[in-house]
Amino acid sequence: METASRRDHFPNQQLSQTIAQRFAQKSFTPLELYCFNCVFRSLADTESGVHYWSETTLCRFLELPDALGVGSVIFQMASYLGAFPLPSQAPAILTYEALLKVVTILTERYGAVVKKRGREIWLREIYRSLAIYDKGIRSSLEDKEKEKEKDVPAPVSSGNMGFAVDAPDDGDEGDEDEDDELVLAALDSMDAIDAFKHGEQSNVHHSIIPTDNFLKLVELLLLIAPIDAQQSLSTLAPDLSDTRVAELRRAAHVIISSFGVENHPGVTYRTFNAVISTCLPYLFNGLNPLFEHFLFAKDMDLSKRKGGPNSPTKESKPVIPPPKAQSEPILREPGEILNLTILSQLSFFLKGSDLFRRLRPLYSGNTHGFSMGSFEKQVFNWRAPTILLVKGRLLPTTPSTTRERALQDMLPPKRHPSSITPDSLSSNQTLIYGAYISSQWKHTGKTCFGDASTTLFQLSPTHDVFTASAFSHDYTYFSKSPTTPAGLGLGTPIPTQSASHSSHSHSHSHPVFRPGPVSLHLDDALEFAVFTHLAEGGGSFLPSKLPARKGSDWQDRFEIESLEVWGCGGDEVAEEQRRTWAWEEREAEARRRVNLGTGDQEMDRELLKMAGVISGDRSGGSMG
């Protein structure tokens, strides 16, 4: 009886209106609510006395490009979120209250009302808004996953504590009660939990996101990643050419492949949560500023509003200043690897505030030359984080050139397949690996440099991220011959003197190079690269957390086509680098201008000392 009375006391419509009122009171300022009201009423359609937004109106207001075909996906998300906290009422008509809830959730302003584990539960709501519920499809999908798990050999266990740190998390279906924590917390404040628990829970584990819908959404997210709350989508991408659309689609396919959709009809919640949490934590960030547009009432046509005694006059309408002109473009100049689309892909796991309008091109192999010396000259003076990108094609199994044979001789016999599987050889064969290096580059002595924020990643043909491990700190190295390993890379320890001597004794011409369990190595000619991934881990970087790659070992040996380094930082870092380069140039010019040629070494040395080029101990000057 008590439950029944509570359900009668909180009918569905009242529950929906009450939560909308709570969001309005606690999540927005009065000015923001006024702007939202102006936006809604100026564009709303009316039928049977109900004001609402249609799919066409929503897509036109957000300026969603027709070329991406994503309007129906966004409208589906909005229709589901508009029914919050009652999923059985979805799809909801986008009335004032429903659309206010959509904006609250997608701009992540619900925290003032719902404080418990907000981000994690928010991700569940995003999944639900994209998913379809079909137990038949879901059961078939689970059977396929179980069959695949039988075929994948279990990773070899080890007593080494380092491997325990690296062991990929199997994930958890989670308690059913946790699925609705956001909803329960919201209703708890209204004493309506019992009403909700009787028939209002939806099980995310009986659903999937259709691949095509997810692909279209990811294309949009790639496009809007750099958008500002006061920037319209039409100004961000005024000319969405066929070339750009194809570029967005290719990148979206790469990202979608990380969800293992090649062998499945869609994305399950377990896979969605695992991939987003580990490899794409900022994927949905662009939705926040996009839906913030509802809170800026600039240039709105209020002619459709009916005047009334309490209606604000035109003069009382708040004046929202136009967005400030950006002093910097999103990306000053594209590289051979890095363009706007790849930059957006990077922003899905590196903070966009460190990337957009903050990157400077430091080094390009095809511009500055593929040599360690050129790399050092262009990169070492950048005293801020850098992003290294390398692109190439797989080497043939049998070496065809002297250099390829030398690489093969340097490495142990190849025991693992490449990451490009035989059934995908006809599609994307381009390999792109990279790294985020937080420390300034330097010559490697006895130990590597870098810290736990150093990150390895793959951008093609699959999106994957390999974060730093606590087991080992061999993050980054830059070593010239005869130091081994000669070249640059991440994740391989510098051998001790005794180990290096032992390696030389086994091979007089080519010491064997043994890459770390998860590592990237570029040879000292910057001609070839090797990426190694062992699922057992145990090195400086954690193995892949992608469910589709669970237990997988691979090694990609490829010829480098393009190599780039980009500096993260503002004008102040670039100015410091310019000052350092200018100082080095002055030092070199001073050496050239000293008139030597007396034939007397002591006199020549005294002249250099007088010029301040060298000190009394015969060494060159320093920056002090």
Swiss-Prot record:
PROSITE patterns tied to this protein: TLDC
Comp. bias intervals (Basic and acidic residues): 143-152
Statement: the UniProt record of this protein carries the keyword Cytoplasm: yes
Keywords assigned by UniProt, alphabetized: Cytoplasm
Main subcellular location of this protein, as a coarse class: cytoplasm
Domain annotation TLDc: ranges: 336-569
UniProt record similarity statement: Belongs to the RTC5 family.
Protein name (record): Restriction of telomere capping protein 5
Taxonomic source organism: Pyrenophora tritici-repentis (strain Pt-1C-BFP) (Wheat tan spot fungus)
